[in-house]
């Protein structure tokens, strides 16, 4: 196995020391070191490389990140395809902008607190135990919320990326070959990531859902590329018009439904059986006069109720007759006596005699 030391760096660098120039002075000039694919398994003290800004250590056998505390000017660190299982000892790299950790054994994204300048984080294709997925430490996500612009989490068996909504300045998300299933979850995420303009989700089950692309384009106005394909203005405008037409039809349908419901409710109330109390009004106008001759005609022709006895019929006839006689007598005037039998009345005779005299 090989350990990365300053001597190894000096031997493999293209530096040509000047006369009377020390090793420390030479190492201080180094800004880029490339020791990729050299079977390196550990990192020695690199404090003499104070101006180191880019370090390539990918495709090695490094299992632990150490001795980078004094490389405070480091901006790019390439550690992909090593044997790293834990992200640690990076808090002093205040100027770090790009960190590549893909192809390792990392199960949790953590230990990045304090990296306020980190813009790109690549943690794709971690070699995880079967059935496990890559997780995110909330503290790390909070610390990267304002700085991170590019995140690569591809091929990590991830089925939920809701936690990423805190990354308010994220503009490029790469999450291909995961287990994302639901379009609704992606819509909610896109509503939060207002600056996201490029997203790659190829290889996820969600890509096979109906209207997947259309729904995401309609949700995010900032998105310009989806799954490697550009979103053109004409495509977005067409989808917006289609959605507006669809929404208008829904609103119209709801209004018609409400109107029909109201009409049916009115008819239903109208048809409801109510108990109506009858109101009787007194008869107004001239009363009908029943003459004795009419009653006789009624009885002769048998129109009276069969239930009435002969005795009842006689009584009724007599009562009506008496009533008619009384009314006739009271209405007589001195000149109006047409019935001979009334002359037998003494008072009537007296009145007639006085009139003649």
From Swiss-Prot:
GO terms for biological process: regulation of phosphatase activity. Phosphorylated; during the first round of spermatogenesis with a marginal increase at 21 days after birth. LRR repeats lie at residues 29-50, 51-72, 73-94, 95-116, 117-138, 147-168, 169-190. It comes from the Eukaryota. GO terms for cellular component: centrosome; cytoplasm; manchette; microtubule cytoskeleton; microtubule organizing center. Residues 329-357 are annotated as: Disordered. GO terms for molecular function: actin binding; dynein complex binding; tubulin binding. Its main location: cytoplasm. InterPro entries: Leu-rich_rpt, Leu-rich_rpt_4, LRR_dom_sf, SDS22/Internalin_LRR. Testis-specific. Expressed in spermatids (at protein level). Testis-specific. The keyword Disulfide bond does not apply. Residues 204-242 form the LRRCT domain. SMART domains: LRR_SD22. Keywords: Cytoplasm, Cytoskeleton, Leucine-rich repeat, Repeat. SUPFAM superfamilies: L domain-like. Residues 335-357 have a biased composition (Basic and acidic residues). It is found in: Cytoplasm, Cytoskeleton; Cytoplasm, Cytoskeleton, Microtubule organizing center, Centrosome. Interacts with PPP1CC isoform gamma-2; the interaction is direct. Interacts with actin, dynein, KIF5B, KIFC1 and tubulin. Associates with microtubules. Regulates phosphatase activity of protein phosphatase 1 (PP1) complexes in the testis. This is Protein phosphatase 1 regulatory subunit 42. The lineage of its organism: Eukaryota, Metazoa, Chordata, Craniata, Vertebrata. The gene is Ppp1r42.
């Amino acid at each position: 196995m090989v350990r990365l030391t300053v001597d190894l760096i000096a031997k493999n660098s293209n530096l040509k020391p000047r006369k009377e120039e020390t090793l420390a002075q030479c190492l201080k000039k180094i800004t880029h070191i490339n020791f990729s694919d050299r079977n390196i398994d550990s990192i020695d003290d690199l404090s003499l490389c104070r101006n180191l800004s880019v370090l390539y250590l990918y495709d090695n056998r490094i299992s632990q990140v150490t001795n980078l505390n004094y490389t405070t000017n480091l901006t790019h660190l390439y550690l992909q395809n090593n044997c790293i299982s834990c992200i640690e000892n990076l808090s002093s790299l205040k100027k770090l902008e790009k960190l590549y950790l893909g192809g390792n054994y990392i199960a949790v994204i953590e230990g990045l607190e304090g990296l306020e300048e980190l813009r790109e984080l690549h943690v794709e294709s971690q070699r995880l135990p079967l059935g496990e997925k890559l997780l995110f430490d909330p503290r790390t996500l909070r610390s990267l919320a304002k700085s991170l612009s590019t995140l690569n989490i591809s091929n990590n068996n991830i089925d939920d990326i809701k936690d990423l909504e805190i990354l308010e300045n994220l503009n490029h998300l790469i999450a291909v070959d995961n287990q994302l299933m639901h379009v609704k979850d992606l819509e909610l995420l896109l509503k939060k990531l207002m600056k996201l303009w490029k997203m790659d989700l190829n290889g996820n089950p969600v890509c096979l859902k109906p209207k997947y692309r259309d729904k995401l384009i309609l949700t995010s106005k900032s998105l310009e590329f989806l799954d490697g394909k550009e979103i053109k203005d004409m495509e977005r405008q067409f989808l917006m018009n289609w959605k507006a037409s669809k929404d208008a039809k829904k609103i119209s349908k709801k209004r018609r439904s409400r109107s029909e419901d109201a009409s049916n409710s009115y008819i239903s109330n109208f048809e409801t059986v109510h108990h109506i109390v009858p109101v009787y009004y007194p008869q107004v106008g001239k009363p009908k006069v029943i003459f004795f001759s009419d009653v006789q005609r009624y009885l002769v022709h048998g129109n009276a109720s069969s239930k009435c006895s002969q005795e009842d019929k006689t009584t009724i006839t007599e009562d009506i007759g008496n009533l008619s006689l009384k009314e006739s007598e009271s209405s007589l005037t001195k000149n109006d006596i047409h019935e001979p039998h009334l002359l037998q009345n003494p008072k009537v005779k007296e009145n007639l005699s006085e009139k003649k005299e």
